[in-house]
């Protein structure tokens, strides 16, 4: 048998045994030493996992939409569990550089340590949130493949539950979930046998996956950058056309501050790569003459922005003037996000606020999905 195929089969068997076999229970006490940094900048070790009645370890990914769904359940139950001797530790397992751009399309944040801090502040996490994305020590020891997933250990450090946090179609009934009932049983002092539930969520990205991310980045860098002339009629069509999903317009000139344009275009290019598979569209409109066309393309190529790129004369912008926010003392560059129905959303003159723009794009896409 092919050696590579044999290894794949053996890996699969190991996962199945771990998930299904009661004899495959693990103990916190048997885990190798680990040192994980929390968003509170404290270092957590195995000795911190010392709940009087048990310990709950939950692996979450910032970018995983299923993980995001269960944040409230964890936040709202944390104090109760802690006061009854159950410690909760949430851990982010992903190797950040292996995450593909479009895998971030359902989150306003990625999985870096700094973005974990932002998520903890944004959602008011009241539990320890630890980073294992760099070395993935505990992630590998527990054979974590999918987030979210929960490991519940009893007061003797024995694993008594592995599986999902709850049901995504029953978010308001978390108290009836298998995990919640197991925790209540531990609090009541009951002796429990190991059980598991089926996982669903987002695959964990490991350092070995970075080659895939690099290949994708290379393909992006090879995408053809084109620019075409637009008159007022065509530009107005793009602006007024009703769509299911939002679109972003960026108006600029070759006379704008070079660094400002570069940073704006790089930000827009990044978000276009993240959100375009969800239906997000980007239009860049350079106000300038045809003899500058090659220079325009060069600027866009440096930003790797393979969107709908247009150029036009200043006299063709009459119908687009209403998109410009009434701020600033110069005309360009300006940015405007428009909903599918034409409503004006995020807009600015000058530097793009990357966080505000991403939040606006994400919210608009989510709203559009809910209308489908």
Language-model segments: residues:
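Non-globular targeting/processing and membrane-anchoring segments
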Residues: 22-55, 164-247, 360-372
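Bacterial N-terminal signal peptides that target proteins for export
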Residues: 1-9
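Conserved helix-turn-beta segment immediately C-terminal to the redox Cys motif
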Residues: 69-92, 245-246, 262-286, 301
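Short active-site neighborhood of thiol/selenol oxidoreductases, capturing the structured segment around
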Residues: 47-70, 183, 238-262, 268
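Bacterial N-terminal signal peptides
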Residues: 8-17
């Amino acid at each position: 048998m092919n050696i590579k195929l044999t290894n794949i089969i053996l890996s699969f068997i190991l996962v199945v045994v771990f998930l299904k076999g009661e004899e495959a229970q693990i103990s916190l006490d048997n885990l190798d030493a680990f040192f994980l940094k929390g968003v509170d900048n404290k270092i957590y070790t195995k000795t911190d996992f010392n709940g009087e009645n048990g310990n709950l370890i939950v692996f979450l990914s910032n970018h995983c939409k299923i993980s995001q769904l269960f944040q409230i359940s964890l936040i709202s139950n944390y104090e109760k569990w802690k006061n009854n001797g159950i410690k909760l530790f949430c851990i982010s397992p992903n190797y950040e550089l292996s995450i593909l751009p479009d895998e971030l399309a359902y989150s306003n944040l990625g999985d870096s340590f700094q973005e974990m801090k932002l998520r903890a502040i944004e959602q008011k996490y009241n539990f320890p949130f630890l980073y294992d994305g760099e070395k993935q020590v505990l992630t590998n020891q527990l054979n974590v493949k999918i987030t979210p997933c929960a490991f519940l250990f009893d007061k003797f450090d024995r694993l008594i539950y592995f599986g999902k946090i709850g049901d995504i179609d029953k978010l308001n009934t978390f108290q009836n979930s298998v995990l919640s009932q197991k925790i209540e049983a531990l609090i009541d002092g009951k002796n429990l046998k190991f059980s598991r539930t089926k996982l669903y969520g987002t695959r964990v990205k490991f350092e070995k996956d970075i080659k895939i991310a690099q290949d994708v980045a290379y393909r992006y860098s090879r995408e053809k950058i084109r620019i075409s002339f637009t008159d007022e009629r065509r530009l107005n069509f793009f602006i007024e056309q009703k769509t299911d999903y939002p679109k972003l317009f960026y108006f600029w000139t070759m006379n704008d501050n070079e660094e400002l344009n570069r940073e704006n275009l790089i930000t827009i290019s990044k978000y276009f790569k993240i959100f375009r598979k969800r239906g997000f569209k980007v239009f860049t409109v350079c106000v300038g003459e045809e003899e500058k066309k090659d220079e325009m393309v060069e600027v866009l190529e440096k930003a790797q922005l393979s969107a709908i790129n247009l150029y036009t004369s200043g006299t063709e912008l009459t119908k687009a003037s209403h998109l410009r926010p009434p701020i600033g003392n110069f005309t360009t560059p300006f940015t405007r996000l428009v909903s599918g129905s034409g409503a004006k959303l995020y807009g600015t003159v000058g530097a793009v606020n990357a966080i505000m723009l991403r939040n606006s794009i994400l919210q608009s896409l989510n709203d559009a999905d809910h209308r489908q």
